[in-house]
Amino acid sequence: MAGSPNEDSEGSRITYVKGDLFACPQTDSLVHCISEDCRMGAGIAVLFKKKFGGVQELLNQQKKSGEVAVLKRDGRYIYYLITKKRASHKPTYENLRKSLEAMKSHCLKNGVTDLSMPRIGCGLDRLQWENVSAIIEEVFEATDIRITVYTL
């Protein structure tokens, strides 16, 4: 069985890389969490806003908590998991799971095989990575989608 030494469990969906998320392969789609108001005023969301813009495009999609907004940039998708109503709120694991399910559907419909993300929901949003990673594993277990998580 092939696997990297950093994988905790056999057959893990998630590979961990220490480095800059934005240096991931151009073929990877990117993922992060935002609120319905698309403020993106703190944390890694600020970098997504600067790099990819499209705030009005995201707002026009009128996505609610538990859904996913999507931008297409340079031949790849940028996924915005909508995990809370307002920027000042905190997300729930349930909304995170629903938005991951919505993203999975989009990935499968559009042939996306590689996702790169930070430890979503675990910075300013204060979710626990052991819970978040378990949800990611469950949501993507019956797919061939590869997930790389970047940490600094």
UniProtKB/Swiss-Prot annotation:
Classification via Gene3D superfamilies: Leucine Aminopeptidase, subunit E, domain 1 (3.40.220.10)
Catalytic reactions of this protein: 2''-O-acetyl-ADP-D-ribose + H2O = ADP-D-ribose + acetate + H(+); 5-O-(ADP-D-ribosyl)-L-glutamyl-[protein] + H2O = L-glutamyl-[protein] + ADP-D-ribose + H(+); alpha-NAD(+) + H2O = ADP-D-ribose + nicotinamide + H(+)
Annotated residues for binding of substrate: 21, 119-125, 152
Location of Phosphoserine modifications: 4
GO biological process: DNA damage response; peptidyl-glutamate ADP-deribosylation; protein de-ADP-ribosylation; purine nucleoside metabolic process
Annotated Macro domain residues: 2-152
Keywords assigned by UniProt, alphabetized: Acetylation, Chromosome, Hydrolase, Nucleus, Phosphoprotein
PROSITE patterns: MACRO
A GO molecular-function annotation: ADP-ribosylglutamate hydrolase activity
InterPro entries assigned to the protein according to its UniProt record, in alphabetical order: ADP-ribose_metab_enzymes, Macro_dom, Macro_dom-like
Enzyme class, broadest EC rank: hydrolase
Active site per database record: 84 (nucleophile), 125 (proton acceptor)
Notes on activation and inhibition: Subject to competitive inhibition by the product ADP-ribose.
One term under GO cellular component: nucleoplasm
EC number: 3.5.1.-, 3.2.2.-
N-acetylalanine carried by residues: 2
Coiled coil: none
UniProt-annotated location(s): Nucleus, Nucleoplasm; Nucleus, Nucleolus; Chromosome
Role according to the record: ADP-ribose glycohydrolase that hydrolyzes ADP-ribose and acts on different substrates, such as proteins ADP-ribosylated on glutamate and O-acetyl-ADP-D-ribose. Specifically acts as a glutamate mono-ADP-ribosylhydrolase by mediating the removal of mono-ADP-ribose attached to glutamate residues on proteins. Does not act on poly-ADP-ribosylated proteins: the poly-ADP-ribose chain of poly-ADP-ribosylated glutamate residues must by hydrolyzed into mono-ADP-ribosylated glutamate by PARG to become a substrate for OARD1.
UniProt-recorded name of the protein: ADP-ribose glycohydrolase OARD1
Encoding gene per record: OARD1
